[in-house]
Amino acid sequence: MSPSAKKRPKNSRVSKMQDEKLRDETEQPVSKVIERNRLRTVLKNLSLLKLLKSSNRRIQELHKLAKRCWHSLLSVPKILRISSGENSACNKTKQNNEEFQEIGCSEKELKSKKLESTGDPKKKEYKEWKSQVQSGMRNKEKTSLAAMPRKEKHIEPEVPRTSRDDSLNPGVQGRQPLTEGPRVIFIKPYRNRTPMGHMKQLDVADQWIWFEGLPTRIHLPAPRVMCRSSTLRWVKRRCTRFCSASLEMPMWHPYKVDVTWTRARGASRGWRSRHQLKGRNGWRNSRVYK
């Protein structure tokens, strides 16, 4: 036994499932995976915005549109080559049912063969006699039917006539035999129609479909940033930035211009300049120059 043969799984179904997963991963290019992840992030951000700003109609419409797009991806996996959980589960159940049916048929055949091989000669004789009796009864019935007169032979039970509604619709008679056999349901391809218009119809094999009306990027509101951390807020002095200001709308203070101050500004300028000049050479401001 080689080491490669030992590593192989004993169950053939497990190996088949692994091969199918690898094929799905190789078939989907990198761009498709990126676009699917982008749609997922857009849906998450829109759901957060809906929680924060529930009264905004624009955000609600975008959230509904994103949900439709996501459900359409799950409902049409074959067209977009996406393996959804529901379809894989259905396929698994179908495969298991088929396998169980095959196993049941094989077991019945084996049991019948065993009975034939290990059966008693008396039972065999009884079976042969029973089959001969049944064939004789059938032949008697055929001869009795042939001996009946022609008039009685041709008399058949009258077929109940259809009502007026059925007579008006000739297609009803053609539909009746179809219901007896197995019904086949044909699912029409689901076409997404957004309020912005039809989706971009692109080649699925080469390009990925992006849905119209959805934003590619969503800017969530930024959290409030404090000027200092909680440990240093009371130790160090206050900073010039307002603590409760957010990044989106910083705080600003409007300055009111006083009329009296502007008028008296020129008159007081001369007195202030003289006082400053005298103070530089005096003893009052001597501490500054020491």
UniProtKB/Swiss-Prot annotation:
Q: Where does this protein have compositionally biased stretches of type Basic residues?
A: 1-13
Report TM segments: none
Q: Does the keyword Hydrolase apply?
A: no
Source organism superkingdom: Eukaryota
Q: Which UniProt keywords apply?
A: Cytoplasm, Nucleus
One Pfam short name: TP53IP5
The disulfide bonds in this chain are none
Q: Name one GO biological process term.
A: intracellular signal transduction
Keyword Cytoplasm: yes or no? yes
Localization? Cytoplasm; Nucleus
Instruction: List the expressing tissues.
Output: Highly expressed in heart, brain and small intestine. Less abundant in skeletal muscle, spleen, prostate, ovary and colon. A smaller transcript is expressed specifically in the testis.
- One Gene Ontology cellular component annotation? nucleolus
Q: Which InterPro entries match?
A: TP53TG5
Please state, per the UniProt record, what induces or represses the expression of this protein: By p53/TP53, UV irradiation, by hydrogen peroxide treatment or by treatment with a DNA-damaging reagent.
Ranges for region Disordered? 1-29, 114-178
Q: Where is the composition biased (Basic and acidic residues)?
A: 16-26, 114-130, 138-167
Q: What does this protein do?
A: May play a significant role in p53/TP53-mediating signaling pathway.
Which proteins does it associate with, and in what oligomeric form? Interacts with p53/TP53.
Protein name as it appears in the record: TP53-target gene 5 protein
Gene name of the encoded protein:
TP53TG5
